[in-house]
Each structure stands twice: as C-alpha cells, then as structure tokens.
Amino acid sequence: MKFVTTGLALILLAGTAQADFSANVGWASDYYFRGILQSPTSPSGGLDYESKGFYVGTWAADVYDGLEVDGYFGYGGEAGDFSYSIGYTGYFYTGDFDETYQEINLGGGYGILSVDVAIGQYDGDFDPIAAGNQQDYTYYALTLEKDGFYGKYAGFSQDASGSYFEAGYGFSVAELDLGLSVLFADEDLSITGDSNESLIFTIGKSFDLN
C-alpha cells in the first residue's frame, strides 16, 4: 500500500458493479513513506479485493531488516463531485526495523484536490524521553493531481513531527506503471538529522485475478 510516488498509495475504484481481485508487484529506487526513508531500493507486492466500494488487502515490501507487511480495509465512494474514504491500516514488521503502527485513515477529494488524514498509534518511541509509552500521531496530506502530475505537502503532529514536499509524474508504458518524483523532507524525518532531497524512480505492474 505504501508506494513511493503516492506516499500510501491505495487507489479506490469505488462503486464498481462486481467484486474484483487484483495483485501488484513493484520496485522503487528508494522506498520512502511519508517522507521517511525505509530502504534504498525495495521490491514490493500486494493482493487486493474490492466490491462496491468496500476493499481489503495486504501489501509487503523489503526494508532494511526483514519485511514490512501491511493489512488494510475500508470503504470509498463518491457523492456528486466529491469522493471520500474511511479505513484502517496496520503496519507490521518481521525483523527489528520498526515497531507496529495502527491507524484510522480518512480521505476526501474534489476535482484535482484531495486531503488525507491518518490518526494512529505507534508501539515504538518517536522520542527517547518517552521510551516505553505508546505514541500517538496524526498525519495530514494535501495533494493536487492532474493528468498524471501531482504535488503533495504533508506532515505530522502530536508525538511525531516533521513535514515534506513531493512532486512527480506517473504514466503507463506497455502495461507497466512508471513514476518519477522528487522529495524534499525536513530534518525531523531523517535518521541522520539532516534534511533529505531525493530523486525517486518506481516501476510496477497490476494483475486482474478475476
């Protein structure tokens, strides 16, 4: 679910007339999620089921130590020119790379503008001073998208902090989904304490399993 060029990266096909099973595979030159580097070069894959706006799925990617495995479900729909979604996502890890995240996801859109909010809890420690306590965070993102081009400003509040800007272009060639993006993240989102500027390339392919 956490593909680089979209930052989380679920695309809901709400309101379809039949149930759809699909799979996806991908690769990223650098795997960033919400402005934070997860791994330099990362393969990924996922499975999804969607029916009349309801969806459930799983997605996994290689990270520094082990695998990240996500599970998610929710509902997305449209009302006139507005789109909306609500769901749950859990982020789990097989190694020592990170601890579990769980969050409620809210989304809304109108035309080329979309707003996403995640309200979550983290089993690790954003701040060493708060070690041993579950951490709360809110993630917010504002995205403008048109004809494959997009720009996003996003950040964190509560126990987490930091913000980033991302811009890119996604397109399809020979049934492959390609993306090129640039990302500028502040020092709060860097493990080195320095700001990040990155050029990211992604490639992926989706499969209809019906």
Q: Where does each model-flagged region fall?
A:
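Outer-membrane beta-barrel proteins
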Residues: 3-7, 11-210
